[in-house]
From Swiss-Prot:
The gene is pgi. Belongs to the GPI family. Pfam families: PGI. This is Glucose-6-phosphate isomerase. It is found in: Cytoplasm.
Length: 554
């Protein structure tokens, strides 16, 4: 029986019941003591693949916990669900669509059938189209209206058309080729438009409009503003095609805008926005780093795909991360999860993960429309490196909530400065160590006495210096950030999110809450700008509309 047609009530499975009992037995488990008792714990609770090394030994688990979590994944049908996704079954049940972002990174010669058609031909045709335009721009064959070469590319898109490409193009800045700079215009905010365009020369700027329907409000408004900016700075209608290209499934709308059909790249219904950076949505990435590096990005993701499909669950990196998340969210009550990358180039990784995870698994009904039987979708947050240590890490160490964390760090920096990276790496390891070890009352008192404080002062200050410890974390290490390893890293978390969605029985590939916001936004706009519009449905919204109108009247 297909999981997406008849999802299981996971809380009724024997493996779920076994985990509930195990959780009670783990109430007083100490990671400190576990490491003392088992010198092989690190080796037993770590795994590597696709250029990534995962240490998950600093978790509230034993080998028995891992066995029970893996049993739950098997009993919930994760293996069958993964096969269904990769083979093109319509696992996005609410929209009756296949989910095939994984096809975008499969090699030429593979076959994936959708409605009787091998979509791999379309995938590699689009890659060839991308290669052509990247080559022309990098070889100075594509020129603007004044015959100058392209130096800047502005991607106009929002959500998945923005977050993934921005993450990758910034993470791979050391791989930038031919001096092409990428910029991103997403928000419908005049200030953002002003800040982006202020850096640009209209004669050497190319805009990419990324919108599946060519009708996304924020994207269309920014595209129209960019067009007006281009015309106002000396560009002509006749040569507009040299400065605007599109990634869309609505060819006619793009042609009507002034874009030549050969400069329109495809989008497909079987690729969701938050999983689309591997497609022509990734064109700004390819323009920045070149097609060879872009294909390495795809290859890294493909390597993780194969690991996910073939590796036993006991050593399957996406499955292990997913089930650890289930363990903390559903059995320990953790409501949020922190991601802490220790590299400046990964500073936007958390923003991409927020969409990937919360837009995917922020659901309260299962695939068949029935209410979920357990909590889903934790809050995803975090930030880059040592900055967080001087901000929110305090909450991780001494706060009352249990907040699991993933640390992500490369061994080698692209930009070595003195011993900076050694200190950065040391900070990363010491934070995960401090979360695990903490500081006992005895250790706090001994530390204060060693400073010569009176016993009264020792007793007064010691409670404040106690750090509970026993806080779980994973540490993901890679040699250095490269296109292949970054591709594997992103695919790792894509599959983690998918596995959790299967466990909860939800559809990780629709986003009806987002759609409601779009609908109401149009209604509120009309109520703000048209005095003959019906009033808002609630007094709060109407009051805020009236405040806006009053301010704009003078």
């Amino acid at each position: 029986m297909s999981y997406y047609q008849h999802p299981l009530d996971v809380t009724g499975l024997p493996s779920w019941k076994a985990l509930e009992e195990h959780r009670l037995a783990m109430q007083h488990f100490s990671m400190r003591e576990a490491f003392k008792a088992d010198p092989t714990r690190f080796d037993d609770l770590s795994v590597s693949c696709s250029g990534l090394f995962l240490d998950y030994s600093k978790n509230l688990i034993t080998p028995e916990t891992r066995t029970l979590l893996v049993n739950l994944a098997r009993e919930a049908g994760v293996e069958q669900a993964a096969r269904a996704m990769f083979e093109g079954e319509r696992i996005n049940a609410s929209e009756n669509r296949p989910v095939l972002h994984t096809a975008l990174r499969r090699p030429m010669g593979d076959s994936v059938m959708v409605d009787g058609k091998n979509i791999m031909r379309d995938v590699h045709t689009a890659l060839a189209q991308m290669t052509d335009i990247v080559t022309r721009i990098h070889n100075n064959l594509w020129r603007g209206f004044s015959d100058k070469t392209i130096t800047d590319v502005v991607n106009i898109g929002i959500g998945g058309s923005f977050l993934g490409p921005q993450l990758v193009s910034e993470a791979l800045l050391p791989f930038t080729q031919h001096g092409v700079r990428t910029h991103y215009l997403a928000n419908i905010d005049g200030s953002e438009f002003r800040e982006v365009t202020a850096k640009l020369n209209v004669e050497t700027t190319l805009f990419i409009i990324s919108s599946k329907t060519f009708g996304t409000l924020e994207t269309l408004k920014n595209a129209q503003a960019a067009r007006n900016w281009y015309l106002g700075k000396g560009g002509t209608e006749e040569k507009l095609y040299r400065h605007f290209i599109a990634v869309t499934s609505n060819k006619q709308a793009a042609v009507d805008f002034g874009i030549r059909e050969k400069n329109i790249f495809p989008m497909w219904d079987w690729v969701g926005g938050r999983y689309s950076l591997w497609s022509a949505i990734g064109l700004p990435i390819a323009l920045a780093i070149g097609m060879s590096n872009f294909k390495d990005l795809l290859s890294g993701a493909y390597s993780m795909d194969q690991h996910f499909l073939s590796e036993p669950f006991e050593s399957n990196m996406p499955v292990l991360l997913a089930m650890l998340g289930i363990w903390y969210h559903n059995f320990w009550g953790a409501q949020s999860y922190a991601f802490l990358p220790y590299d400046h180039y990964l500073r936007n990784f958390v923003k991409h993960l927020q969409q990937m995870d919360m837009e995917s698994n922020g659901k309260s009904v299962r695939q068949d429309g029935t209410p979920v039987s357990c909590s889903t979708g934790p809050v995803i947050w975090g930030g880059v490196g040592a900055n967080g240590q001087h901000a929110y890490h305090q909450l991780l160490h001494q706060g009352t909530p249990l907040i699991p964390a993933d640390f992500i760090v490369p061994v080698v920096s692209h930009n070595p400065v003195a011993d900076h990276h050694e200190w950065l790496y040391a900070n990363c390891l010491s934070q995960s160590q401090a979360l695990m070890l903490g500081k006992t009352r005895e250790e706090a008192e001994a530390e204060l006495r060693a400073k010569g404080l009176s016993e009264a002062e020792v007793q007064r200050l010691a409670p404040h210096k106690v750090i509970p410890g026993n806080r779980p974390s994973n540490t993901l290490v890679m040699e250095t950030i490269s296109p292949g390893r970054l591709g594997a890293l992103i695919a790792l978390y894509e599959h983690k999110v998918f596995v959790q969605g299967v466990i909860w029985g939800i559809n990780s590939f629709d986003q009806w809450g987002v759609e409601l916001g779009k609908e109401l936004g149009k209604a509120v706009y009309n109520q703000m700008t048209r005095f003959d519009a019906a009033p808002a449905e609630d007094a709060s919204t109407q009051g805020l509309i009236d405040f806006f109108r009053g301010r704009h009247r003078g």
